[in-house]
A protein has these predicted regions:
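Alpha/beta enzyme core
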Residues: 28-34, 137-140
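Glycine-rich, proline-tolerant flexible connector loops at the mouths of alpha/beta enzymes
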Residues: 38-55
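Short hydrophobic "strand-cap" motifs at the C-terminus of beta-strands
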Residues: 19, 177, 204
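N-terminal amphipathic alpha-helix/helix-capping segment at the start of soluble metabolic enzymes
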Residues: 1-20, 241-245
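Hydrophobic residues within beta-strands of alpha/beta enzymes
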Residues: 39, 93, 145, 196-197, ...
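C-terminal helical cap(s) of enzyme catalytic domains, especially alpha/beta-barrels
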Residues: 53-63, 106, 189, 204, ...
Length: 246
């Protein structure tokens, strides 16, 4: 392949998908069947979606190869994080509290275990005051920065922040979260993917049975995954058209 040919080929778009806050075997199976890439287990005891380490390990054993278990922690002790991750084969960590870069680094066993760091972005116009570039630089050891809306508690609030206020160029892999549904994820992917290295999406409340936190709806899971794939197809079409433009 010549350099000229390489320049005109469109980049392939495939958005990775994580479903978070699972508590039941049937929901894990439904997510895997739908084709998700990662499953999140909440180990924060104050969350209505909380599961024990033992339960997370039990559910994670249902996962096939190449579907990653993600353990969500909020201001947990380093020793307990390391022990929990060691109990769930193939797990990576997600830090969703007030953990400093140094604390994340230590809890990841100095980079031996990949981790995500959540950024809690204020809702509405207040989001413009959040310095994502500095946050991404401070947590540059993280595999990705997860973008969530700042709400009471830590995550799973079902609210979306203003995506248009994000910086135009973030030197990091991003995970878009917060208030996503099958109805808005295409818009979210379209707005955010051009701003970062790669984009993944993370959903919890948007695929739940109404009023039942931690209980997922298989139809909503499948609808969400289908919407993400439509977004990928749309971006691929746009990239192809751009390459054909003189």
């Amino acid at each position: 392949m010549t350099q000229t040919t390489a320049r005109v080929l469109p980049s392939l778009h495939r958005t990775r998908i994580k479903i978070c806050g699972l508590t039941r075997e049937s929901d894990v199976d439904a997510a895997v069947t739908a084709g998700v890439d990662a499953i999140g287990f909440v180990l924060y005891e104050k969350s209505p979606r909380h599961v024990s380490v033992q339960r997370a390990a039990e559910l994670a054993r249902r996962l096939p190869p190449f579907v990653t278990p993600v353990l969500l922690f909020v201001n947990q002790e380093t020793s307990k994080i390391i022990a929990a991750c060691a109990s769930v084969a193939g797990a990576i960590a997600q830090f969703h509290g007030d953990e400093s870069p140094a604390e994340c680094w230590l809890a990841s066993e100095q980079g031996k275990r990949p981790y995500l760091r959540a950024a809690r972005i204020p809702l509405g116009d207040a989001g413009v005051g959040f310095d994502l570039l500095k946050f991404a630089q401070d947590y540059s050891q993280a595999q990705a920065i997860l973008l969530d809306a700042q709400v009471d508690g830590y995550g799973g609030g079902g609210h979306a922040f203003n995506w248009s206020l994000l910086p135009p160029n973030v030197n990091a892999h991003l995970v878009l979260s917060g208030g996503l549904t099958a109805a808005n994820v295409i818009d979210g992917i379209t707005q955010v993917r051009p701003r970062c290295k790669t984009l993944s999406v993370d959903i919890s409340s948007g695929v739940e049975v109404p009023g039942q936190k931690g209980i997922k709806d298989p139809e909503k899971i499948h609808a969400f995954v289908a919407a993400v794939r439509r977004a990928d197809q749309q971006l691929e079409t746009l990239a192809t058209q751009a390459c054909k433009t003189p």
